[in-house]
């Protein structure tokens, strides 16, 4: 009975690497497509937040900034979780990411979490002008941070993951 259990376990582990490469490659492709979509939304977010920051009394700008932020927020957490698992967990285990880059990514993620918490504290940008201005400035900072994130991931991080797949 133990021999059968070992054989079954061994067979499962033999097949896993055959599935791992297409699965990781698929995740990288999916993240790249999401980054393309996110890039467009980042631009919209920066423009609408800039408009709101310049004129905090502009109700239309405030509403548009909220709408763009909501469209990003809906999938941002799951996207970041997938990246964390793929890059920090799998990439770390397979030495795909240089130590200094890994530290940079973790620092970026901590800064992003703080900023997202700040945005969450004033998501109702219908308040007074100073609250709308703080909301707009937080969204501007988030758009800058997300643009840097997308550029780094598409140019450096995801290609490193793909190289690790085939080395």
Where in the sequence are the language-model features?
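Small-residue-biased structural context
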Residues: 2-167
